[in-house]
UniProtKB/Swiss-Prot annotation:
Key word Transport present: no
Co-factor: note: Binds 1 zinc ion per subunit.
SUPFAM superfamilies noted in UniProt: Anticodon-binding domain of a subclass of class I aminoacyl-tRNA synthetases, Nucleotidylyl transferase
Membrane-spanning residues: none
Gene that produces this protein: cysS
Requisite cofactors: Zn(2+)
Protein name in the entry: Cysteine--tRNA ligase
GO cellular component: cytosol
């Protein structure tokens, strides 16, 4: 099942020798990115647990890795992008106790668990489409891959890294000394921080569930060699990433809050079973509200649907790409106002270029063309440097400043305007995803709009010359009501949106 979202941008025809460096959590430093197969990238992202509507924290993760994927496409790589859907096994306290989050929501809403999963999955798809997030290559669900998870658990038991206890199966942490290498936690430190209340069926409090016995009345249950039950939260990602990307795939991504225990467990499950796992680990930082992490458990979140009622989704996306994926994004009215202003500046520049293009003269503008090329180089260098979107956005603003200055100074040639337009579309649209398909006018539509606006401005100018100011003001106010601003300049009236 795949998300219904925007069409993937065409990968560049250049040879993918991009010079990208990225921050690898495992190595705790920036390292050159070298895919295992030249020109191809396998990428896995931990997706949503579909038991309620998504909030801005979820959007940050999805947009961050969408931009990383788009950047790889821009530099010529073919990308297989897999992101899972957790629709079973994620318990209330993110460990091995409590109710399944989806089963609990099903009881609250008086629905079947799969009705809840479908309802919130499609809600998530709708939100991602609004944010112009590209659909995954593959979007596997945990409940659709129970046999693969059981098979991986059996491998771990056979190799002595898992044990059966009263119908449940646990990973034996002591059998795998490398456990903790991603997060940098030592086993003795983990033992000190473990809760005193430990399930009696565990040999060690640090062990985690691979398969859970289904208690009487539990709604989600499958047959297994150990009796009826359901998979633990961590096993699905190991099983599904290996199935669709193979051993030693290139990039595994997710939120910083998943580094431990989820990603740590994923590595242990795969490698203890003899399967080399992800080669690079990338983690996005959180969204905060008043300095605290935005989360459902804290109750300090606002759903994306509620935000969409107040803000253009593209303004929200602009807010998210304006900070680095490894930096904290603060949720505030001031941040949204700044994002709205910045995004409007870019879109107005693009619209003005599209407005001027049909009548642009065939003249050379070598100085402006060189400036445009310089901004493109700056943008691409920023994205090569661990996907530095703040610097990339700054390059777009630099492009905007130079193009606006040239337009204000007089006529700009068709070649320079075309180069500027293509830079906005390729970099701002294709890489950062800020100009969703269908949200900026096609060239033929733009020409029609421009011609109609010229007629309206001529009519308004006629009223002004005849000193019929009430009629002229009425036209201006009518245009303002639909988001069009008219400015009276020395060169005559101009309009913008």
């Amino acid at each position: 099942m795949t998300q219904a979202s925007s069409t993937s941008p065409e990968p560049s025809r250049r040879q993918p020798d991009s010079g990208i460096v990225l921050y690898d959590t495992m190595q705790r430093q920036k390292v050159p990115f070298v895919p295992s197969v030249p020109g191809r990238v396998g990428m896995y992202l931990c997706g949503p647990t579909v038991y309620s509507d998504a909030h801005l924290g979820h959007a940050k993760k999805e947009v961050a890795f969408d931009v990383i994927r788009r950047t790889l496409l821009h530099f010529g790589y073919q990308v297989r992008y897999v992101t899972n859907v957790t629709d079973v096994g994620h318990l209330q306290d993110d460990s091995d106790d409590g109710e399944d989050k989806i089963a609990r929501r099903a009881a609250l809403e008086r629905l079947e668990p799969m009705e809840v999963a479908d309802k919130y999955f499609w809600s998530f798809v709708e939100d991602m489409e609004a944010l112009n997030v590209l659909k995954p290559s593959i979007n596997p669900r945990a409940t659709g891959h129970i046999p693969e998870q059981i098979a991986l658990i059996e491998e771990l038991i056979e190799r002595g890294h898992a044990y059966v206890s009263d119908g449940s199966v646990y990973f034996d942490v002591r059998s795998w000394p490398e456990y903790g290498k991603l997060s940098g936690r030592r086993l003795d430190e983990l033992e000190e921080g473990t809760r005193e209340a430990v399930r009696e069926e565990k040999r060690d409090p640090r062990d985690f569930a691979l398969w859970k016995r289904a208690e009487p009345g539990h709604l989600m249950r499958w047959a297994s060699p150990w009796g009826e039950g359901f998979p633990g939260w961590h096993i699905e990602c190991s099983a599904m990433s290996l199935k669709y990307l193979g051993e030693g795939f290139d990039i595994h991504g997710g939120g910083l809050d998943l580094e431990f225990p989820h990603h740590e467990a994923e590595i242990a499950q795969a490698e203890a079973a003899g399967h080399p796992f992800a080669r690079y680990w990338l983690h996005n930082n959180m969204v905060t509200v008043g300095g605290e992490k935005m989360s459902k458990s804290k109750g300090n979140f606002t759903t994306l649907k509620a935000l969409f009622a107040q803000h253009d989704p593209m303004v929200i996306r602009f807010l998210l790409v304006s900070s680095h994926y490894r930096s904290i994004t603060e949720f505030s009215d001031a941040a949204f106002e700044s994002a709205r202003s910045g995004y409007r500046r870019l879109t107005e520049a693009l619209h003005e270029i599209e407005r001027r293009l049909p009548a642009a003269p065939d003249q050379d503008d070598p100085a402006l063309l060189e400036k445009i090329a310089g901004h493109i180089r700056t943008f691409e260098d920023a994205m090569r440097d661990d996907f530095n979107t703040p610097r990339a956005v700054a390059a777009l603003f630099g492009l905007t400043t130079d193009v606006n200055a040239a337009l204000n100074a007089g006529e700009v040639g068709r070649q320079a305007l075309t180069a500027a337009r293509d830079a906005y579309r390729t970099l701002g649209g294709g890489v950062l995803g800020l100009f969703a398909e269908g949200r900026t006018e096609r060239e033929d539509d733009s020409q029609i709009v421009n011609a109609l606006m010229e007629l309206v401005l001529q009519a308004r100018q006629h009223y002004r010359l005849q000193k019929q100011y009430a009629q002229a003001d009425e036209l201006r106010n009518t245009l303002a009501a639909v988001g069009v601003t008219v400015e009276d300049t020395r060169e005559g009236p101009r309009w913008r949106r």
